[in-house]
Amino acid sequence: MVDHLLPVDENFSSPKCPVGYLGDRLVGRRAYHMLPSPVSEDDSDASSPCSCSSPDSQALCSCYGGGLGTESQDSILDFLLSQATLGSGGGSGSSIGASSGPVAWGPWRRAAAPVKGEHFCLPEFPLGDPDDVPRPFQPTLEEIEEFLEENMEPGVKEVPEGNSKDLDACSQLSAGPHKSHLHPGSSGRERCSPPPGGASAGGAQGPGGGPTPDGPIPVLLQIQPVPVKQESGTGPASPGQAPENVKVAQLLVNIQGQTFALVPQVVPSSNLNLPSKFVRIAPVPIAAKPVGSGPLGPGPAGLLMGQKFPKNPAAELIKMHKCTFPGCSKMYTKSSHLKAHLRRHTGEKPFACTWPGCGWRFSRSDELSRHRRSHSGVKPYQCPVCEKKFARSDHLSKHIKVHRFPRSSRSVRSVN
């Protein structure tokens, strides 16, 4: 709405009646009068101050453009005189005297301001009780929120918090609620713009709004704890050793519907202070080494779930089962080994060979199984190099040393 403000500092004189409506506004100690269109509301052809479809409206447009006619000047001066008399109530700071129309209006001639082709009218201000006056529709915040929830478009999504400053200008509500739209701005952020012909209404977040992933393919990461239990008799742990019931983080990666589980490789610490008699001196077979570990250090940080955690060497080397026979101080890591050892002291041999004509008996079941191979001729242990077979595993271990240290190297060592 365009307001034409005219300062009432000059002296005007006219006995005619006003035309149109009045809006008085006081700024400080100076009185201003707001001049709307003097044309009637019922005249649809002259509903805009800029439309010139009738002689009266043409005269009004000419006075806005700077060329005032005598009749239009008289009507405006009559309107200002009567309204100033009613508004001031006899106590206005401006005095009304005799002055000619063209001389009084001349200093305030200016070019017409660009206005929209719409008709605006100011409400009347009666002198009665202000509570009884019908006021324009002003919705509350609850009504606006309900309207937005019912009529918000599904394409409108929640805007990130960093762009809240950009949406402050769009959050002012007008008298009638309207829908708001989001358009991508030139700087990469989202900006709010009102629909054509109306003001924007605040609220850029729908009831089910969420962030819209417009970037690359989403990758979902989920961390799950995996408990790793240790034996209860491990004793005091060193500073570099993990405590009991350690939870190792398991990472689940979901890429395009396919889930991959990654777990860190548990590398045994090298700073274990163990007695020398518990240290293994036998070489570890190549196939028994964990994947990814080499002489230069551990392998990659993550392995697939198919690989098992390597056992803690400290838990394997600690012998907690001690022989109670007088004069014997042997200790074993397993109770079954201790029971087999006690049979040697007692002389008990419960495992007997069932081969015809053989009456051998043994205190351990593995000894009986090894003895049966001597009757059947089965040799399950085969050398991977020369494919030679053996009935006992210890015989195979001794044979592998031949391939590790050939006869030529051994002969050279003996000569040196």
Swiss-Prot record:
UniProt cross-references to Gene3D superfamilies, sorted A to Z: Classic Zinc Finger
SMART domains with a match to the protein in the record: ZnF_C2H2
Biased composition (Basic and acidic residues): 156-168
Record key words, sorted: Activator, DNA-binding, Metal-binding, Nucleus, Repeat, Transcription, Transcription regulation, Zinc, Zinc-finger
Tissue localization of expression: Highly expressed in liver, skeletal muscle, and kidney. Expressed in cardiomyocytes. Expression is highly reduced in cardiac tissue of patients with non-ischemic cardiomyopathy and aortic aneurysm, and in glomerular disease. Not expressed in bone marrow or lymphoid tissues.
Residue ranges of the region described as Disordered: 156-219
Pfam families tied to this protein: zf-C2H2
Biased composition regions of type Gly residues, renumbered to the chain: 199-212
Protein localization: Nucleus
Description of what induces expression: In podocytes, up-regulated by retinoic acid.
GO terms, biological process: cardiac muscle hypertrophy in response to stress; cellular response to peptide; glial cell differentiation; intracellular glucose homeostasis; negative regulation of peptidyl-lysine acetylation; podocyte differentiation; positive regulation of D-glucose import; positive regulation of transcription by RNA polymerase II
GO CC, alphabetical: chromatin; intracellular membrane-bounded organelle; nuclear speck; nucleoplasm; nucleus
Gene Ontology molecular function: DNA-binding transcription activator activity, RNA polymerase II-specific; DNA-binding transcription factor activity, RNA polymerase II-specific; RNA polymerase II cis-regulatory region sequence-specific DNA binding; RNA polymerase II transcription regulatory region sequence-specific DNA binding; sequence-specific double-stranded DNA binding; transcription cis-regulatory region binding; zinc ion binding
Keyword Transcription: yes
Subunit organization: Interacts with MYOCD and EP300.
Disease affiliated with this protein: KLF15 deficiency results in loss of rhythmic QT variation and abnormal heart repolarization. It may play a role in susceptibility to ventricular arrhythmias, and development of pathological cardiac hypertrophy leading to heart failure.
Entry domain remark: The 9aaTAD motif is a transactivation domain present in a large number of yeast and animal transcription factors.
Function: Transcriptional regulator that binds to the GA element of the CLCNKA promoter. Binds to the KCNIP2 promoter and regulates KCNIP2 circadian expression in the heart. Is a repressor of CCN2 expression, involved in the control of cardiac fibrosis. It is also involved in the control of cardiac hypertrophy acting through the inhibition of MEF2A and GATA4. Involved in podocyte differentiation. Inhibits MYOCD activity. Is a negative regulator of TP53 acetylation. Inhibits NF-kappa-B activation through repression of EP300-dependent RELA acetylation.
Membership in a protein family: Belongs to the Sp1 C2H2-type zinc-finger protein family.
Official protein name in the record: Krueppel-like factor 15
Source organism (scientific name): Homo sapiens (Human)
